[in-house]
């Protein structure tokens, strides 16, 4: 599903970037993929996808 229509960023691309780069903030994620830098309507959904993927990662499950 497309999250950012302006830049053609899908939830899969966000999840892939989270797994590869382990960003700890949305600003860090934006260094790796161009999400939320045009109209900004996708920021909330992109953050939700990022947080969901972070909580699915094994190293974060052990901490929780």
Curated annotation (Swiss-Prot):
Cofactor: [2Fe-2S] cluster
Cofactor note: Binds 1 [2Fe-2S] cluster.
Positions annotated to bind [2Fe-2S] cluster: 4, 6, 39, 42
Pfam annotation, one family: Fer2_BFD
Single GO molecular function: 2 iron, 2 sulfur cluster binding
The UniProt record lists the keyword Iron: yes
Keyword Ribonucleoprotein on entry: no
UniProt signal peptide: none
Residue ranges the record marks as coiled coil: none
Matches recorded under InterPro entries: BFD-associated_ferredoxin, BFD-like_2Fe2S-bd_dom, BFD-like_2Fe2S-bd_dom_sf
Domain of life per record: Bacteria
SUBUNIT field: Monomer. Interacts with bacterioferritin (BFR); up to 12 Bfd proteins can bind to the BFR.
Family, as annotated: Belongs to the Bfd family.
Annotated function: Required for mobilization of iron from the bacterioferritin (BFR) complex.
Record-given protein name: Bacterioferritin-associated ferredoxin
Biological classification of the source: Bacteria, Pseudomonadati, Pseudomonadota, Gammaproteobacteria, Enterobacterales
